[in-house]
Curated annotation (Swiss-Prot):
The gene is citG. NCBIfam families: citrate_citG. Keywords: ATP-binding, Nucleotide-binding, Transferase. Gene3D superfamilies: Triphosphoribosyl-dephospho-CoA protein (1.10.4200.10). GO terms for biological process: prosthetic group biosynthetic process. It is an enzyme of class 2 (transferase). This is Probable 2-(5''-triphosphoribosyl)-3'-dephosphocoenzyme-A synthase. GO terms for molecular function: ATP binding; triphosphoribosyl-dephospho-CoA synthase activity. Belongs to the CitG/MdcB family. It comes from Vibrio cholerae serotype O1 (strain ATCC 39315 / El Tor Inaba N16961). Its EC number is 2.4.2.52. InterPro entries: CitG, TriPribosyl-deP-CoA_syn_CitG. It catalyses: 3'-dephospho-CoA + ATP = 2'-(5''-triphospho-alpha-D-ribosyl)-3'-dephospho-CoA + adenine.
Amino acid sequence: MTIPAALDLLLELPSQASSSSGSRTFSLPRLVGHLAYHAMMLEVHLTPKPGLVDTANNGAHRDMDLNTFIASAEAIAPYLHSFVSAGWESAGNPAAQLLSALRPIGIEAEQAMFAATQGVNTHKGMIFILGLICGSVGWLKANQLKIDAQHIGETIRQACQFLVIDELKAKRDCEPETAGERIYRQYGLTGARGEAASGLAMVMQHALPAYQACLTKGASTEQALWHTLLVLMANNNDSNLVSRGGLAGLHFVQEQAQQLLAKGGFLYQEIEQALTALDSVLIEKHLSPGGSADLLAATWLIYELVQLFKVRH
């Protein structure tokens, strides 16, 4: 498949009118939000993706398809800009207080998503992860700090350092248990909250280095994303998989991904056919690595942001 040509627009940096000094400026929220929106679109259009919605099929999902995801992404897009603005406006506060500024926007984004999808959860995890990245970039830029993977990860770590303690370990008898809380109680897995509290360790230590290495070796964006998705599937304790198939389902997917990586990943001549075959297996088993899909979009977004601000600095 061909990744949407709309990605070419990312090279056209959105700009405002010239300032009084004649120098051109750009809208940070619009630019970063634009990239985050395309991260969502890139993820869903990447085909094949084992167990996930793509242009070929609905994966292991019966309540959503490609059009559902597109409608959801379009509904969420304005809030991605707002995350950046909220981060910028929080510049006078420490990073540890950033989450409280982003959370109300995240709730509104979820409501917009559910309205666009008739109640289907297409992007809840994506809103959380991309919202943190967008907010962190706004905060870093306003504080005149370097925008690179290390600073983005550390800002998110500080913002979310108490998430696991406050929301998973704390017993809340008066509130209904969320899926993430149930999985933590049953298996001790911290899911998206734990990933955020770690400063996106899975992205920083596994996915981003893999993606960069693939590109260095001459992989196309599509090939690099396939390989990186396999790296995530092999290493990520994906709560989506645990929710659907327990630890056995998680370990099955991890082993399948490890086998394809052992064959060379994107360098394996039959990688596309192998991914298609694994897609069929995961659909039959009703397994969907949705958490890894969210982190794949986050990986691409962080990579593009780092490249962008290298140029702009």
